[in-house]
UniProtKB/Swiss-Prot annotation:
The protein's assembly and partners: Homodimer.
Source organism, top-level taxon: Bacteria
UniProt keyword Transport present: no
GO cellular component: a single term: cytosol
EC annotation from Swiss-Prot or TrEMBL: 4.1.1.23
Listed name of the protein: Orotidine 5'-phosphate decarboxylase
Residue sites binding substrate per the record: 22, 44, 71-80, 131, 192, 201, 221-222
Protein family: Belongs to the OMP decarboxylase family. Type 1 subfamily.
Species classification: Bacteria, Pseudomonadati, Pseudomonadota, Gammaproteobacteria, Enterobacterales
Source organism of this protein record: Escherichia coli (strain 55989 / EAEC)
HAMAP family: OMPdecase_type1_B (MF_01200_B)
Amino acid sequence: MTLTASSSSRAVTNSPVVVALDYHNRDDALSFVDKIDPRDCRLKVGKEMFTLFGPQFVRELQQRGFDIFLDLKFHDIPNTAAHAVAAAADLGVWMVNVHASGGARMMTAAREALVPFGKDAPLLIAVTVLTSMEASDLVDLGMTLSPADYAERLAALTQKCGLDGVVCSAQEAVRFKQVFGQEFKLVTPGIRPQGSEAGDQRRIMTPEQALSAGVDYMVIGRPVTQSVDPAQTLKAINASLQRSA
């Protein structure tokens, strides 16, 4: 176990904003990152960027002071998922996720893999229903539950397995906080400031609505990364959230 970057070496942020980095070019990504302040947000690195640029890219972001949500959505046999989660913890990321549909044994193995890391372990979050999915998509998979009901079933399994929370849509947040309690973390993509295009997300909310619904961490992508002044956009979002708190 070799932690690459301890939490004490990074900037502390109280912002619930996690900016999704979706770049094809490493230099473009770092150019954007150098325009923003790690006190204003955390960063999400997904499958495309991690596949292109690897762990070293994560380290470069950490060296700039950012906490990293490694969004790789591990979904495999329990032993493989556990080793993958431990590797993410070795990298020193702030948060990592798995697919809840991988089942109880997989999620339990992933949680147990983080025990040796103690207080340095990342938050372990499970994905319920992707925000791009609608009821018709679930029907195609042979499921008769609505996206909301299926997400709640997976969230209940996640909590039973001892994980820290789930990725869910903002529409589910109010219900989930009531059912699973305030300590169960909710991470929500599809968050877009007023006036932003919906893009490929189907179930979206503004940051203020998400905060009111009980979302703990809100993932925002293109409204920040494609802004002409991303630093100011982040400050405006955070200011609006402080006013709404």
